[in-house]
């Protein structure tokens, strides 16, 4: 793992620096951390609690997904709040749980839509090899990016460091995410 520079650490929040140092000094090339992704399709199931009930231990990492961001009435709408709660669970477990987020980006501008590009008709607007910011599809992309940025800002403001994995299946093969 590359060493964090003093500048990176001075600019980072206290919790971000603590997480980075923990991963660098206690985990890198020494341990494997377990994790559990939360469900975005069924809010009635708490996957972390299921792991704890089955094993008597909490996973080190709890994963969340911005997949359903902005989709009213869908499960997984409260991923940010759940992640903040997981991080703050230190009161019960004696240590913070590590938060990771991914983003299965659904087709921009559609209510629902698929997240695999092969199943959508959406195209990134390009003009002469450059992103066309005047195209309506650009507005849809920007709107989605702004929604995610708002959620990441909530996490930052709550002091929650995030292992961020956006578009982790962008290469098209979920086997290697």
Model regions and ranges:
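N-terminal module-boundary/linker segments of secreted carbohydrate-active enzymes
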Residues: 1-85
